[in-house]
Design a protein with these regions (language model features):
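Beta-rich ligand-recognition domains in immune and ubiquitin systems
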Residues: 1-182
């Protein structure tokens, strides 16, 4: 149950250096919003996603169990984890979380809840959007488990993780994602 998960709760913040120019960070880097007004000029960083509406967290995990929650304002987002080596400068879908073999994601949209890894999609049953998503990473067990509002288990990935994992969010137009501090 939820009580069990809170033992592993961690605090996350978005890394502004990684944030695509369409994304604006606020609330001490705990909220990322996709501005419909267009991209802002941002200083070039090697770690920035140049063409992909994506941002990573500062925090990363190489071991242990970690639980975090995020609030997604409306459908059109992919939330997951990635290795640091995810491509960041290309155009097209290859840089998106879940669209390469370096990352895993859950797609929230208006039609169908989906899980993605290596660009392969698994359609999931149930509502296609949840405004609050919980994620439990158990590094040694090789599992990433998603929970929807009210702690419904939505999906679990099973994989032998080999590198540090960074929480990652791809954010569609007009959507904001907030990392819950409690």
């Amino acid at each position: 149950g939820k009580e069990g998960l809170s033992a592993y709760r961690c605090s996350l913040t978005f890394d502004p250096r990684t944030a695509n120019g369409h994304l604006s960070l606020s609330l001490e880097n705990r909220r990322a919003e996709h501005l419909i007004s267009g991209p802002r000029p941002v200083p070039p960083y090697e770690v920035r996603f140049d063409h992909t509406w994506q941002v990573l967290c500062f925090q990363s995990f190489r071991s242990g169990r970690h639980y975090w929650e995020l609030e997604v304002s409306k459908p059109w987002a992919y939330v997951g984890v990635t290795y640091e080596t995810i491509p960041r400068k290309e155009k097209g879908k290859r840089c998106m979380v879940g669209m390469n073999d370096l990352s895993w994601s859950l797609q929230l949209d208006e039609h169908q809840l989906c899980a993605w890894h290596s660009g392969r999609r698994e359609a999931l049953a149930g509502p296609s959007h949840h405004s609050r998503i919980g994620m439990l990473l158990d590094y040694e067990a090789g599992t990433l488990t998603y929970y929807g509002d009210g702690q419904t288990r939505l999906h679990a990935f099973h994989c032998a993780f080999t590198e540090e994992l960074f929480p990652a969010c791809w954010i569609g137009e007009g959507v904001s994602i907030t990392l819950c501090s409690t």
